[in-house]
From Swiss-Prot:
Entry protein name: Phosphoribosyl-ATP pyrophosphatase
Record's subcellular location: Cytoplasm
Primary location group: cytoplasm
Pfam families registered for this protein in UniProt: PRA-PH
Amino acid sequence: MTTFTLADLDRIVRSRAAASPEESYTAKLIAAGPGKPAKKLGEEAVEAAIAAVQGDRTSLVSEAADVLYHLLVVLAGGGIPLEEVMAELERRTTQSGLAEKAARRRP
């Protein structure tokens, strides 16, 4: 079991985002504007879904890592702290998924 966390990855992503785009893939993605990292996130999510459907565990682990990385790049580029997303997840765990979805449909 690893001690590496999503918060650890987030710190690395945000550090690399502050680097020069010539030196950092992360910075290059963010410098390209929100469309580029969002497109990469979508591509990786589709690849993860395909690996899941195919039952390819090794590929799914790899693609899931790509999804998490690219999601953190999108968040960093949008100025959204990981803590804000984690707080939303925590809030959602206080009620059932069905109750949470029903609450979102109310005007």
